[in-house]
């Protein structure tokens, strides 16, 4: 891994042989070979830990960066694209049950609702082999703990010549965390066809890169619309983002699952954009935010390893809730998917911001 470290404005380490070490319930650590560290530029007051020819920096005091394709991302990161694929790649555990692996963010070990939606799409696609998920709706009544695996129980409501309907219930330690319905289709030749045009936004090469702590996932946001700064200029409740997942296996249901996995990331940011004095960084600090439900229609086969344009428009915010109507286009402009997101944006009850329990 190519990485570098900065302290007091000076480059103190630059290496192509840095090694990541994941720790349980703690931030991962990046170890630099000692030969790649400029010890003469560092104070002797505990900025580093040495072990077996390697050096680890205190990430709170030293800025550590990793190179990810053409982007530079701040370390520690959540993981890379292979970790995300492993989460989506649910395993069969009986006739109509699938289970996931787990991977936690040490800062807030809560499973994203859109991750569970993506996993349910993968599970249903494998259950009804040869049919493609065309519609999926899921609600998230209870937060799931990212430190524990998830269980997906499927109920085949009907299976005809063309369509299969599957109910999905996501459980953890016997408690229901999400429930939904998925429709799968063998698909058919066109009788009619039309689709809405994509928004007029710059291409991914000229949009601003955004670091969301996953290497191998490229994100570009148009018009500087994603910011944690509460003093940033206000804008319309619209957010356009190009997304690409690199180095994926060929499995089509994983590509569809990854498209779904990102549907919960930016709709709340779009809702906050018109409101002065409220930045995205307030989420989970002074604002209680969460995705409550997602409805997704998949209009075509998905190639998540190519650029996809996610267009988010928040059409309503009030009574502690937001509603967003969104579309996904490929780089050529074809409509891949449409989705809506229901989310909450509320002040934290007294003391709740410091409550480490995973509850909505």
Which ranges hold each PLM region?
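Terminal leader/tail segments of proteins
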Residues: 1-80
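Terminal targeting signals and extreme-terminal segments of soluble enzymes
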Residues: 73-360
């Amino acid at each position: 891994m190519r990485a570098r470290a900065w302290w007091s404005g000076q480059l103190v380490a630059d290496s192509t042989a840095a090694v990541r070490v994941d720790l349980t319930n703690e931030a991962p650590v990046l170890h630099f070979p000692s030969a790649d560290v400029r010890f003469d530029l560092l104070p002797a007051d505990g900025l580093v830990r040495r072990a077996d020819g390697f050096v680890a920096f205190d990430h709170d005091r030293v800025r550590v960066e990793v190179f990810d394709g053409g982007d530079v991302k701040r370390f520690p990161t959540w993981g890379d694209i292979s970790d995300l694929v492993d989460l989506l790649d649910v395993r069969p555990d009986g006739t109509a049950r699938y289970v996931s692996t787990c991977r936690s963010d040490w800062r807030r070990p809560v499973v994203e609702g859109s991750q569970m939606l993506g996993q349910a799409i993968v599970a249903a696609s494998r259950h009804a082999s040869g049919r493609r998920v065309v519609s999926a709706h899921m609600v998230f009544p209870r937060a799931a703990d990212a430190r524990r695996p998830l269980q997906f129980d499927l109920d085949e409501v009907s299976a005809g010549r063309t369509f299969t309907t599957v109910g999905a219930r996501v459980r953890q330690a016997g408690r229901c965390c999400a429930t939904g319905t998925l429709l799968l289709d063998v698909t058919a030749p066109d009788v009619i066809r039309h689709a809405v045009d994509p928004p007029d936004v710059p291409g991914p090469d000229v949009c601003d890169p955004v670091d969301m702590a996953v290497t191998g996932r490229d994100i570009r946001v148009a018009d500087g619309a994603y910011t944690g700064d509460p003093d940033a200029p206000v804008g319309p409740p619209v957010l356009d983002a190009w997304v690409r997942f690199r180095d994926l296996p060929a499995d089509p249901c994983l590509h569809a699952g990854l498209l779904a996995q990102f549907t919960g990331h930016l709709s709340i940011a779009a809702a906050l954009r018109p409101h002065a004095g409220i930045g995205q960084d307030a989420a989970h600090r002074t604002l209680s935010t969460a995705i409550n439900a997602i409805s997704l229609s998949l209009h075509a086969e998905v190639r998540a390893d190519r650029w996809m344009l996610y267009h988010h428009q928040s059409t309503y915010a009030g009574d502690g809730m937001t509603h967003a109507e969104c579309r996904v286009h490929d780089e050529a402009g074809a409509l891949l998917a449409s989705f809506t997101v229901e989310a909450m944006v509320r002040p934290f009850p007294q003391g709740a911001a410091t409550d480490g329990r995973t509850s909505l």
